[in-house]
């Protein structure tokens, strides 16, 4: 199924905007890592793989103690991978918790430094001093998932998350090919109708392209073997 909700500029990204079903798999970036939303996905029988920041959620051990994230990260070698069975605290006291699995990957030093530079630039633009933990966490990929290890190993979870970039590319393609970023109408209702029309066109194009790719790349059907005649080669002069 395809679900679309079109909001105004004041509407925040949230997994609560959609109705999830058993068998669904949610892929989301840091903006979707909200504790109650993730629990709602799991309660619906769906699963999630989302990226998180070091302080986005209150992570706990299964005993309810604070999970020492940076101690776990310190044990990883470059490009090393690890996972931990944890829980997400749903209230301040941490008495209500939801089980989850944390997958951690240490980046190469080159990639880590690029991420740290990005974090510093963002802090400068906001007129702030970058947090030391933010710089440290920039050297890692942190994924939270409801998938257990029997269904998806840590490497599989990381591979699933990389599929998210294909989704990003779809929206970039929409903005480029359909001029989706330009709104010719100022009225909210007209603008909404215009965007919906563009999205319908995009879905139709996607179906047409899919059918074309499934078709053989020849204009004429290949005749049966019985209809083919094999003429002997002409002798060389």
What are the residue ranges of the model-derived segments?
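Single, function-defining residue in the core of a domain
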Residues: 1-237
């Amino acid at each position: 199924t395809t679900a679309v909700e079109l909001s105004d500029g004041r509407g925040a990204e949230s997994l609560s905007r959609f109705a999830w079903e058993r068998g669904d798999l949610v892929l989301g970036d840091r903006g979707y890592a909200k504790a109650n939303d993730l629990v709602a996905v799991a309660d619906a029988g769906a699963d999630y793989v989302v990226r998180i920041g070091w302080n986005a959620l209150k992570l706990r051990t299964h005993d309810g103690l604070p999970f020492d994230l940076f101690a776990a990260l310190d044990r990883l070698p470059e490009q090393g991978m690890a996972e931990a069975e944890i829980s997400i605290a749903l209230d301040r006291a941490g008495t209500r918790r939801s089980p989850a699995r944390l997958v951690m990957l240490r980046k190469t030093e080159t990639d880590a430094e690029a991420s740290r530079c990005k974090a510093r630039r963002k802090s400068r633009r906001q007129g702030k001093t970058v947090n030391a933990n933010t710089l440290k966490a920039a050297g890692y990929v942190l994924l939270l998932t409801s998938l257990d290890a029997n269904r998806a190993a840590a490497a599989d979870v990381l591979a699933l998350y990389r599929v998210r970039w294909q989704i990003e590319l779809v929206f970039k393609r929409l903005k480029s090919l359909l001029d989706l970023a330009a709104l010719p109408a100022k009225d909210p209702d007209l603008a909404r109708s215009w965007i919906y029309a563009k999205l319908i066109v995009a879905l139709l194009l996607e179906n047409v392209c899919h059918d074309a790719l499934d078709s053989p790349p020849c204009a004429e059907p290949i005749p049966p073997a019985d209809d083919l005649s094999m003429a002997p080669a002409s002798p060389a002069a």
